[in-house]
Amino acid sequence: MATAAYEQLKLHITPEKFYVEACDDGADDVLTIDRVSTEVTLAVKKDVPPSAVTRPIFGILGTIHLVAGNYLIVITKKIKVGEFFSHVIWKATDFDVLSYKKTMLHLTDIQLQDNKTFLAMLNHVLNVDGFYFSTTYDLTHTLQRLSNTSPEFQEMSLLERADQRFVWNGHLLRELSAQPEVHRFALPVLHGFITMHSCSINGKYFDWILISRRSCFRAGVRYYVRGIDSEGHAANFVETEQIVHYNGSKASFVQTRGSIPVFWSQRPNLKYKPLPQISKVANHMDGFQRHFDSQVIIYGKQVIINLINQKGSEKPLEQTFATMVSSLGSGMMRYIAFDFHKECKNMRWDRLSILLDQVAEMQDELSYFLVDSAGQVVANQEGVFRSNCMDCLDRTNVIQSLLARRSLQAQLQRLGVLHVGQKLEEQDEFEKIYKNAWADNANACAKQYAGTGALKTDFTRTGKRTHLGLIMDGWNSMIRYYKNNFSDGFRQDSIDLFLGNYSVDELESHSPLSVPRDWKFLALPIIMVVAFSMCIICLLMAGDTWTETLAYVLFWGVASIGTFFIILYNGKDFVDAPRLVQKEKID
């Protein structure tokens, strides 16, 4: 049993110190943070001055250094998601960012503005839905990983034993990590999605749980973070685990998703779908092998399902992926290319059964994890499906939900919940819960990476494609276009700051936030708007002859259209690009 983190906390604030008091039964510990020296020590309750301003909090997210100095981030609101084998799982819904400094008089005007921007970035990440924690259970590991642990591992604190891929506040907790005596105040927080449901089929009650864990390695937003880095970390990597708990028995099925693991980029440039660029100089095999070496160590066999188009701009990526798998020649990897859009065109989504039939035997070989009510491991999952499309969102989620349902069917039959011959699809009440949960999972993952809800969720929710769903997809696509081009630079900077990819240095001579804009940034849009306005005016206020009117309209019309295409040609100068972490042209 892991050493639990403190659940009941009070924050006492004085001009000199922050005191975080543990209020659990029998606890006397008080975490003390000196607001001047930033020193972290352990005290007892009698050391808290009675003059301190006191408030309840629900956890320490960590500390961060900005231009004005250090800040303490605490969880101020939480909601209960559910209970997980008698462990309560919480969702953090509100936070406070508290400055160590009592005044900002030591800052220049530029520093004040930069500090304000950095705080806005921090709050932007904190306002993204999907931060989860438990004070008694390790959410970062799958059931199977937790079953293969040593007694020493079991005695570690939650922070020490957590899978660092999924601890989103790992950078913020670095000061507390260095001092084992304060680890019970350090709360590892997961980012992703968790839902829990008590369900009934044939009068038999069971708990059904869905957990998606987003990796904090190579984290970022849709168009600015693609492919892999030099260490083999894939963009938008998410581990999704589906769990069943029935009569003391526990079963789980794990899948992963992640960007195509070669060096490629797709930077926004005002076009609806920027052209993907595959690096011509990077050592693709080195990064590719690093990625799959780690995946095989963690998960076992890899069945890769590549859902991207096999023609057009996506074709070179599909060919590169297939070539890499073939060149590596690993017996632990199987590669399946399934052109989702081609196979399911004209709303023929029933054709997804072709893919399910193709991988059915492989899925049976991979199996799932199962522990009986006596705690004995009955079955191990021997590998995972690693699915991807371009974003690893919409198409990927549809396929993952279908694979998970097939595994769940087998698990519930083995546990005796489903009778022989019964189909999960026929259990209307459970099907509604199942489909909505997977659609909610899709939306959460999409909002965290692309900035909007997922596309194609009408199929996930209802089992069929609808015209209303197509309209909603169009609306979400428009919002994605705007965000990807005009706000994602700020979003990427926010994530880099939060995760520690960028460290603030108040002594920096030049502010990284101050990036001068080229003359084109203001001049060309103004020229286009003026030209378009003049074109409309000439149409409304006709000249003496129609030929004169036509000449004016053509002149201003050509000027506005010409300027529009010049802006499009120079698209990268007009998008909101990241400013904090200098990224290579092709990552």
From Swiss-Prot:
Compartments, as annotated in UniProt: Endoplasmic reticulum membrane; Golgi apparatus membrane
EC number: 3.1.3.64
A Pfam match: Syja_N
Positions carrying N6-acetyllysine: K456
Keywords attached to this entry: Acetylation, Endoplasmic reticulum, Golgi apparatus, Hydrolase, Lipid metabolism, Membrane, Transmembrane, Transmembrane helix
Stretches assigned to the Cytoplasmic side: 1-520, 570-587
Subunit: Interacts with TMEM39A. Interacts with SEC23A and SEC24A; this interaction is reduced in the absence of TMEM39A. Interacts with PLEKHA3 and VAPA and/or VAPB to form a ternary complex.
Stated name of the protein: Phosphatidylinositol-3-phosphatase SAC1
Organism: Pongo abelii
Source species taxonomy: Eukaryota, Metazoa, Chordata, Craniata, Vertebrata
Gene name for this UniProt entry: SACM1L
